[in-house]
UniProtKB/Swiss-Prot annotation:
It comes from Oryza sativa subsp. japonica (Rice). InterPro entries: EF-hand-dom_pair (IPR011992), EF_Hand_1_Ca_BS (IPR018247), EF_hand_dom (IPR002048), EF_hand_pair_protein_CML-like (IPR039647). Ca(2+) 3 binds at residues 128, 130, 132, 139. Ca(2+) 2 binds at residues 53, 55, 57, 64. It holds the Pfam family EF-hand_7. This is Putative calcium-binding protein CML19. Potential calcium sensor. The keyword Repeat applies. SMART domains: EFh. One of its GO terms (molecular function) is calcium ion binding. SUPFAM superfamilies: EF-hand (SSF47473).
Length: 146
């Protein structure tokens, strides 16, 4: 978290264009466009600032900005996990919470890639960290990050 806090501090300084120790909705809009290429309406920027503005001054200080950034980052991670879970469920069989060589073979066949059980076992072995012959959701997440 220390590294993340240092990163948020660096981002805060970059967003604080006039170096007044506060980020306005206008500064937030400009920097979102420059940093991420995302267009943000004035209303969206105001709403985002307002959601994290604990002292009601219409601006974000470094602490408010950091809390907002952490919340947004957590939201992105939750969304990513939901997407991964949807993908995982496509490959698992019978709702057992694991991908077996047979369930992998079945899904790959549906996708037009016809692999034998042996090839599917080999694919699973690469990410089967606990050696149980199947891929758990945790192992699936690691595999998708590789």
């Amino acid at each position: 978290m220390v590294a993340a806090t240092a990163e948020f501090r660096r981002v805060f300084s970059a967003f604080d264009r006039d170096a007044d120790g506060k980020i306005s909705a206008a500064e937030l809009r400009l920097c979102m466009k420059a940093a991420l290429g995302e267009d943000m309406s004035a209303e969206e920027a105001e709403a985002l600032v307002s959601s994290a503005d604990t002292d009601d001054d219409g601006l974000l200080d470094e602490e408010e900005f950091t809390k907002l950034a952490v919340q947004l980052e957590m939201g992105d991670e939750e969304e990513r996990c939901r997407g991964l879970m949807e993908a995982f469920r496509m490959y698992e069989m019978e709702g057992e919470g694991r991908i077996t060589p047979a369930s992998l073979k079945r899904m790959l066949s549906k996708l037009g890639s016809h692999q034998g059980i042996e090839e599917c076992q080999t694919m699973i072995c690469r990410f089967d960290l606990d050696g149980d012959g199947v891929i758990s959701f945790e192992e699936f997440k690691i595999m998708m990050d590789a």
